[in-house]
Amino acid sequence: MASSRVVLILSISMVLLSSVAIATDHIVGDDKGWTVDFDYTQWAQDKVFRVGDNLVFNYDPARHNVFKVNGTLFQSCTFPPKNEALSTGKDIIQLKTEGRKWYVCGVADHCSARQMKLVITVLAEGAPAPSPPPSSDAHSVVSSLFGVVMAIMVAIAVIFA
């Protein structure tokens, strides 16, 4: 009986922890892709980027490209040499280190006038996600409290069963 309890606890732990360990592919711009006149700041605002995740840039390679730049080049929309551009139309960038990351399109005025630029903050692999802004919605508070109470009840039931 005790061994089945241990197996159950380990199984539940593995399921809960596996969601943390799985890398995420972030499709930049979602269904719009990497294009002009899109608010990438707004797009990135509710996303959590972690070491091991991927950024996927989908775009028409005849019209756009992707440069990874630093903060200074990002602000001024200045680009490295053209041969450093990613230009396949389906570029995948693995986020290997934590910190700020900057990406721009180097075609014409796409960065400076058409907002084709993205800045993100990459968190360490196991770091907790930033807290969302406080909600005034009483329903979300009740839902969260209900989830915590249910998790505690299940844990107690497993331990004392």
From Swiss-Prot:
The keyword NAD does not apply. InterPro entries: Cupredoxin (IPR008972), Phytocyanin-like (IPR039391), Phytocyanin_dom (IPR003245). Glycans are attached at residue 70. GO terms for molecular function: electron transfer activity; metal ion binding. One of its GO terms (cellular component) is plasma membrane. It is a single-pass type I membrane protein. It comes from the Eukaryota. One of its GO terms (biological process) is response to symbiotic fungus. PROSITE patterns: PHYTOCYANIN. Cu cation binds at residues 64, 105, 110, 116. Residues 24-124 form the Phytocyanin domain. The keyword Iron does not apply. Residues 1-23 form the signal peptide. Induction: Accumulates in roots, in a RAM1-dependent manner, during colonization by arbuscular mycorrhizal (AM) fungi (e.g. Glomus versiforme and G.intraradices); the expression level correlates tightly with AM development. It is found in: Membrane. Disulfide bonds join 77-111. The chain crosses the membrane at residues 141-161. Keywords: Copper, Disulfide bond, Electron transport, Glycoprotein, Membrane, Metal-binding, Signal, Transmembrane, Transmembrane helix, Transport. This is Blue copper protein 1a. It comes from Medicago truncatula. The lineage of its organism: Eukaryota, Viridiplantae, Streptophyta, Embryophyta, Tracheophyta.
